[in-house]
Amino acid sequence: TGTQKVLANFNGAGDAIGWEDYLASLPALEALSKESTDSGKLLYASALVLKAQEDKTYAGGMIASLSNPWGDTASADKAQTGYKAVWPRDFYQVTMAMLALGDRVTPKVAFEYLENVQTSDKTPGYSGTPGWFLQKTHVDGKVEWVGVQLDQTAMPIMLGWRLWKEGVLTDAEMTTWYDKMLKPAANFLTDGGTVNIDWLKNVTITPPKTIQERWEEQTGYSPSTTSAIIAGLVAASDIAKLAKDDESAARYLAAADKYSSGLEKNLYTTSGMLNKAPSDGNYYLRISANEDPNDRGLLGVSNGQENVNESEVIDGGFLELVRYGVRSPLNKEIQNTLPEIDDTSLPDIVRVKYEFSVAGKAEKLPGWRRYGKDGYGEDTSAGRGYNATGKNAPDGRGRVWPIFTGERGHYELARTAANGKLNDEELSKLRNTYVTAMEIFANEGLMIPEQVWDNVGSNQTYNFTAGEGTNSATPLAWSHAEYVKLLRSYADKKVWDLNASTSARYVK
């Protein structure tokens, strides 16, 4: 029948080019399947999901999700972008995952696309210092959100560096892209500048302080943002040397060293509010509004959460310092923060870690929320979806994100290796914890959601089971990307995202 023929062509039967052909073009699939605990089912689905995020008109335009989060409560009277847009941060995760699969074509096209979302004198409505990458855009480059997130300016540099090191970009191509895209980005990360667009009226940016961190909500000094900035600048220095721009190469390294030297001073509290055992008051903050992590300053209002003290909010962003090679997994401050992030005795409002029971498995599997006092999710009084009443609920609650199980799985790989204990038995334990958990969080259609239910508060609206995906963005490309990269890291026995030049400079 006609339907069967269309399906056959879609899959790639005979001479038709289809999805089976794309899977066949990925040389790493078979090896990575062996790192899974579901015989590769979620991996193959993830490969398809990630490639499907690429726009079909604007080649290389990788979006965050083909969904509107909590779409059941979103009005259909007018079009809403939702997550069907380009964020350079999500873009980086997806592109690095595709490279991990062995796709050398899509990542190159995607990297070249990024020029469309970088600020310049051609950006409509913009005046100020060029070089930073826009927060959120449509695939055609039209601006939607304009918050300056410095990790999103670092990640295109990190991506370009990696493509060059993997041989996807030649020396000549890398030099060309340095001159027209990466040098302005690195200059912005080094010098900052003045920004004037939409609600940002002549705002001065002074790195590493960022207008918004990776959750797009708070201004200040962020461990995850700063780790990307440092790795991006070290990568930029390598590329500048290739381009025979030695003066800039030295400037970028000097800035990276300066930011690195301020990490603990600006971001690590020694008198935190989370100080009852196993917590001890010594930990990396999610974000510090200024350079004093001990002043217990208030964070900005976000998702209905008001009067939040920075000292009581932790997240896993500090693990990015290890992921990108800025700090050793055995670093004292890194290890001192683990008890807080793992403290299941904390009140639910500030607690981050939750564990999930799985049929037939004695051990519970771990998951983490974005951060304490996260309001981006169902309310606790009735279990209604985010913004269901048309405004932020004061009892809204962000749930567990599968991404962070992958991030922790990467950290534990790095820590086990640094301790000299990475053998087949230990790797199997890691795999059966972190890989299995991410597979369990996927739904029956093999889609990994943004968030899964943590069993806190009322469940009367949706009657979710613990660990089941909520009505948050599904599939979330970043979730699938994190899963793919975790498999690649376990196959390689080293963290896929690690920046070798950064690690060589800062990890002693």
Segments and roles (model prediction):
Residues 34-42, 123-151, 222-226, 242, ...:
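Extended ligand-binding clefts on enzyme/binding-domain cores
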Residues 27-35, 48-53, 92-106, 155-173, ...:
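Well-ordered alpha-helical scaffold segments within catalytic/enzyme domains
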Residues 105-106, 181, 247-251, 255, ...:
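Alpha-helical positions within canonical tetratricopeptide repeat
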Residues 69-80, 131-148, 195-221, 292-304, ...:
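Acidic/His metal-coordination segments adjacent to aromatic residues that form catalytic metal sites
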Residues 6, 10-16, 81-196, 222-230, ...:
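Aromatic-rich carbohydrate-recognition surfaces in CAZymes
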Residues 1-82, 171-172, 498, 505-508:
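Acidic/polar, glycine-enriched structural segments that form the non-catalytic walls/loops
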Residues 30-63, 112-134, 155-224, 247, ...:
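Active-site acid/base region of carbohydrate-active enzymes
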Residues 133, 391-404, 434-508:
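CBM-like carbohydrate-recognition segments
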